[in-house]
Amino acid sequence: STVSGYTSGGSDTGLSNVIDKFPFSTDANATDVGDLTSTIFRTTGQSSTTHGYSSGGTTHPDGLYTGSADIIDKFPFAADANATDVGDLTVARYFSAGQSSTVSGYTTGGYGTAGLHDVIDKFSFSSDANATDAGDLSVARFIHTGQQY
């Protein structure tokens, strides 16, 4: 969205499922506009022109490399609403990076129960479905950033 920023999930004194929204046009506090399908943190974000996505993460409160998730949650930009689970990543993981093209979301790298991952997962914005393995990073990594051009 070019109108608002969104943030979802995370941790404060516990795990959160909150979807927050704030305007780009003026300096203002965020408001709670919905919930993810689970309390989760260390997720990855992607955006289409109409929806926000949260993928992967961990649902384990100690965050000690357990409880990795394969969830792909989707929520609308047009109306304040809860997210729906629309698919799964090929590998459950967290500390991944997120990228978005005009037609697909990507979740890259990360850490899961099997250790570091190099997988590039791709999921369609036009239909709700599981991600597919679109390739591999040059090295397995986690706690990295994602960009698109």
Predicted feature locations:
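Polar, enzyme-active/binding microenvironments
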Residues: S1-Y149
